[in-house]
Regions:
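Short beta->alpha linker loops
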Residues: 68, 87-91, 113
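Gly/Ser-rich helix-loop-strand patches that form or flank binding pockets
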Residues: 98-142
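Generic structural signal for helix capping and beta-alpha/helix-loop junctions
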Residues: 43-44, 95, 117
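Small/aliphatic-rich secondary-structure junction motif
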Residues: 2-53, 80
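Active-site phosphate/pyrophosphate- and oxyanion-stabilizing loops and adjacent acidic/basic residues
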Residues: 24, 71, 75, 128
Length: 142
């Protein structure tokens, strides 16, 4: 059964560009709808007690950077007729999985972060978490 609704995660990195290119090809080959998601994770610093909210300017900087990434995704997908580019805020892996379920996508395509070694073991990766918890197939592009 061909894919009908493809979701790709995009963060502006070289690997996410490769993943988006693969997603565009899949969408064209299967006459599928393509959705591109970028998740803006604004960290909340904790200093040994109550939460400290980041100053508004820091939040604004994150959102401006996110908008630049969204604009790049729109530019890269401009040749497709039925593309939706979505900006979410939160933990990237959780937001991707939540949106995948909400949107009814039947394939997720994303780049491998490639943290490697100890960093990936300790920190994990967005792609690893998505692969482990997704209810639909996930294609990881390296």
């Amino acid at each position: 059964m061909p894919y009908q609704n493809i979701l790709t995660a995009f963060d502006g990195s070289a690997l996410s560009v490769k993943a988006l290119e693969k997603a565009i090809k899949f969408a064209q080959d299967h006459a599928a709808r393509l959705e591109v998601i970028h998740v803006c994770h604004i960290p909340v610093p904790v200093f040994g007690g109550p939460l400290y909210a980041a100053p508004f300017n820091e939040d604004k900087d994150y959102l401006l950077a996110a908008q630049a990434i969204i604009d790049e995704a729109k530019r890269l997908t401009s040749q497709l007729p039925d593309v939706q580019v979505i900006l979410k805020q939160g933990q990237p892996a959780l937001a991707i999985l939540e949106y995948a379920e909400e949107s009814g996508c039947d394939l997720i395509i994303m780049g491998s972060r490639g943290l490697g070694g100890l960093r990936e073991f300790v920190l994990g990766s967005v792609s690893h978490h998505v692969v482990q918890h997704s209810k639909v197939p996930v294609l990881i592009v390296k």
